[in-house]
């Protein structure tokens, strides 16, 4: 099993925490949720393929994490993270 590696822009991470109340360190934990749902995000995939992951964080919050894969797919770049809306929460398995 390969180890997950993460990266993000520190300024974006700080702005995200202020706006949405979600730290990217917490958002990382969604990637180990075995029930998380991966969703393609073609509307935001101009320069690179972007995805949204809906899953539980280590703080037991249902989060939506926008991300892309870098390198040869072994680095996950977190773009944004926020609490899932009630409507989005219904899509969690």
Report residues per predicted region:
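Ribonuclease/tRNase effector modules and their secretory precursors
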Residues: 1-93
């Amino acid at each position: 099993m390969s180890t997950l590696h993460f990266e993000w822009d520190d300024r974006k991470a700080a702005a995200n925490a202020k706006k949405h109340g979600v730290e990217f360190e917490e958002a990382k934990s969604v990637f180990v949720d075995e029930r998380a749902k991966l969703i393609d995000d073609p509307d935001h995939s101009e320069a690179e393929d972007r995805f949204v992951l809906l899953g539980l964080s280590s703080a037991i919050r249902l989060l939506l994490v926008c991300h892309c894969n870098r390198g040869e797919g072994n680095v996950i770049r977190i773009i944004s993270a926020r609490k899932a809306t009630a409507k989005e929460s219904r899509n969690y398995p």
